[in-house]
């Protein structure tokens, strides 16, 4: 996180995507900025300052998940969303709670790898182009016993790569000149559609046993991969596609993965955010039926992770002491006090998110960056159609969404997506075949498309 992103600036960035819920935005912004403050303190004091985990309570579709997800993107932090109901108590079949930390590390590794790929891209592209030149204009092979034995040893060790031209080739002046010509054409982009045959590493098959080992922090695929040669398959690709494959290969050779994994672990420990959804579903307020896995048992399993513990992963041990946990739930049939007291104490910041009003729906349709209306306008623009919504139509859509939520299940802003899809289904279907330059959605059109469904309560439940 950078020093420039103060709590106020974080809230301003969240405002671009999320309407209302100012209290929740302020709380997450302060919790996040406290991480930066902690890193400015002496090392000894840093260890004693733990993150102020947060508990969000509010109906579905009001922005709980979106606030956390956008927050992670703003500060470029590893983020995972998990559902509390997916976990089972230790001793039962199912995902153990430590898997959320392993998922977070995987996300951090992916982010670090992406950063490193960008860092070495120019160098990797140059190497990939050199390999393409040698694949398009191969040298004259010179086989001898020594080289054959060397290749056999490389294959047994898993290091042999058919894409990599071998040293035992003879390059004549004619071949050298042709390669220079091909290299020049590649640089000018003249050979992008030409086909070339390369060897591509075959994706390993999913092994259920490997998944079980992964939950224990053991990477079976890595262990077996070091012992067994990598399987490859021949593929004929366009030069443009083959280059991307070779760039990936060359990038991996240029990256120091031991160092990358260490940085990923550090990134997880200092910046990681875990969003635990549906925490209300594992409270005592939701009574357990006979034979059901103990909900309190899951809470007690989550407790040490949130309190701060060390989890074994295939990249190394990860401390959860400074990971920020955000728990959320509707709490329609229970309340936060139904959580076990120890877990309540680990979420000192409580935020209640408000149900969305009709005015909120109007703003959600129009104001956010890449709002729903902007998305549909952009989609139909691809067909050469200019889609226009009148203000009266927008107000009517918001009114319908609010009334349907009140009359049936309240699913918050998600109702808008359902209504818009029904409203625009004919336009989306016929769009590619229409020659109309502009389509205006009026209040009258909204009423025509949706009035029958709204009047019939049974249809409303099934369609909207």
From Swiss-Prot:
GO terms for biological process: protein unfolding; proteolysis involved in protein catabolic process. Its main location: cytoplasm. It comes from Lactobacillus johnsonii (strain CNCM I-12250 / La1 / NCC 533). Belongs to the ClpX chaperone family. HslU subfamily. GO terms for cellular component: HslUV protease complex. A double ring-shaped homohexamer of HslV is capped on each side by a ring-shaped HslU homohexamer. The assembly of the HslU/HslV complex is dependent on binding of ATP. ATP binds at residues 19, 61-66, 277, 342, 414. NCBIfam families: hslU, PRK05201.1. This is ATP-dependent protease ATPase subunit HslU. It is found in: Cytoplasm. CDD domains: RecA-like_HslU. Keywords: ATP-binding, Chaperone, Cytoplasm, Nucleotide-binding. ATPase subunit of a proteasome-like degradation complex; this subunit has chaperone activity. The binding of ATP and its subsequent hydrolysis by HslU are essential for unfolding of protein substrates subsequently hydrolyzed by HslV. HslU recognizes the N-terminal part of its protein substrates and unfolds these before they are guided to HslV for hydrolysis. Pfam families: AAA, AAA_2, ClpB_D2-small. InterPro entries: AAA+_ATPase, ATP-dep_Clp_protease_ClpX, ATPase_AAA_core, Clp_ATPase_C, HslU, P-loop_NTPase. SMART domains: AAA, ClpB_D2-small. GO terms for molecular function: ATP binding; ATP hydrolysis activity; peptidase activity; proteasome-activating activity.
């Amino acid at each position: 996180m950078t020093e420039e992103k103060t709590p106020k600036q974080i809230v301003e960035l969240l405002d671009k995507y999320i309407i209302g819920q100012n209290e929740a935005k302020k709380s997450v912004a302060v919790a996040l900025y406290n991480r930066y403050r902690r890193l400015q303190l002496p090392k000894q004091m840093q260890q004693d300052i733990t993150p102020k985990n947060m508990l969000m309570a509010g109906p579905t579709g009001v922005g709980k998940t979106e606030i956390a997800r956008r927050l992670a993107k703003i500060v470029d932090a590893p983020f995972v969303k998990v559902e509390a109901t997916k976990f089972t108590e230790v001793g039962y079949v199912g995902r153990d709670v430590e898997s959320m930390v392993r998922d977070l590390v995987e996300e951090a590794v992916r982010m670090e790898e992406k950063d490193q790929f960008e860092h070495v891209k120019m160098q990797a592209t140059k190497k990939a182009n050199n390999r393409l030149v040698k694949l398009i204009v191969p040298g004259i092979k010179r086989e001898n016993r020594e080289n054959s034995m060397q290749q056999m040893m490389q294959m047994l060790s898993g290091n042999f790569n058919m894409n990599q031209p071998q040293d035992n080739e003879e390059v004549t002046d004619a071949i050298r000149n042709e390669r220079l010509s091909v290299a020049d054409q590649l640089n000018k982009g003249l050979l992008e559609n030409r086909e070339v045959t390369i060897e591509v590493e075959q994706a390993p098959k999913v092994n259920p046993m490997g998944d079980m080992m992964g939950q224990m922090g053991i990477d079976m695929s890595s262990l077996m991969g070091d012992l067994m040669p990598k399987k490859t398959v021949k593929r004929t690709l366009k030069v443009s596609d083959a280059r991307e494959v070779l760039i990936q290969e060359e990038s991996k050779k240029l990256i120091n993965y031991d160092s990358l994994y260490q940085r990923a672990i550090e990134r997880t420990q200092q910046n990681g955010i875990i969003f635990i959804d549906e925490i209300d579903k594992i409270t005592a307020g939701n009574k357990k039926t006979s034979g059901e896995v103990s909900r309190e048992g899951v809470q007690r399993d989550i407790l040490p992770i949130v309190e701060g513990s060390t989890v074994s992963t295939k990249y190394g041990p990860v401390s959860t002491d400074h990971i920020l946990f955000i728990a959320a739930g509707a709490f329609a049939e229970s309340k936060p006090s139904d959580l076990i007291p120890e877990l309540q104490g680990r979420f000192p910041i409580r935020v209640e998110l408000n149900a969305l009003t009709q005015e909120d729906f109007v703003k959600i349709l129009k104001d956010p960056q890449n709002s729903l209306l902007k998305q549909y306008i952009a989609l139909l623009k691809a067909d050469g159609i200019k889609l226009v919504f009148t203000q009266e139509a927008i107000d009517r859509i918001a009114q319908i969404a609010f009334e349907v939520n009140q009359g049936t299940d309240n699913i918050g802003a998600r109702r808008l997506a359902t209504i818009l899809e029904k409203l625009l289904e004919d336009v989306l279907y016929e769009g590619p075949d229409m020659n109309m330059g502009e389509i205006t959605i009026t209040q009258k059109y909204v009423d025509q498309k949706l009035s029958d469904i709204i009047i019939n309560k049974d249809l409303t439940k099934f369609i909207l």
